[in-house]
């Protein structure tokens, strides 16, 4: 389990950040202004905003006051705003799964074998609908992250005291383990919070069809017969229109870029694939026509 956890923790995504042309100094070609970087799946995109802005600052219009912002920087994928409060890998898995057959064809036609997620940096005084405003940069992200851990701790244990009782030193070490990509420290503290037999499992299901939405079901550790609940059990209960006993699945479940087998016990999946915010993020992605044909064989 430790080896798989480490692989999940080390996962990164190649990203290219372009800039909304309206933010560029007159005369600058938008195609000439990009930032390329690798962002960990197990991190928040906005943790990298300062690094991105440092590379772009000289190309941006002077109307933007970087010290006393009266607006907000945010990112979009093909015009769709990306909510910063979800781990980056979960955003990627769900957003590129909107129409995988088209994206698969696009990748086949690409000369490069490297998959790069192309995003756009935007700035506005009014926030996109549903997006949590950021007014305190990294400090606010840290507070939100700790809130998520308290919520997940309550789901797991029926109380948040395991998180609330962390010393200030351990709380700071916990947060810094994400910023510094310190796998050992992260799990050393996380495993003090996660019980061997939880009451429920912290879970977020990311759907992009028929509309973008997040579902947070109440998932028991065991079914009514005392058997560990599997991924399939949960899906048939929460998403019966997509996953049923008799029909070939029209979608697949992806976490950290890995397609998850339906028969995997849900808590075993959580132990191996939980994200930095203590939740198990599952992205529901439509299967391609070719995949549907293979599944029926």
UniProtKB/Swiss-Prot annotation:
One of its GO terms (biological process) is cytoplasm to vacuole targeting by the Cvt pathway. Coiled coil: none annotated. GO terms for molecular function: Atg8-family ligase activity; cargo receptor ligand activity; enzyme activator activity. Keywords: Autophagy, Isopeptide bond, Membrane, Protein transport, Transport, Ubl conjugation. There is a cross-link at residue 150 (Glycyl lysine isopeptide (Lys-Gly) (interchain with G-Cter in ATG12)). Belongs to the ATG5 family. Involved in cytoplasm to vacuole transport (Cvt) and autophagic vesicle formation. Autophagy is essential for maintenance of amino acid levels and protein synthesis under nitrogen starvation. Required for selective autophagic degradation of the nucleus (nucleophagy). Also required for mitophagy, which eliminates defective or superfluous mitochondria in order to fulfill cellular energy requirements and prevent excess ROS production. This is Autophagy protein 5.
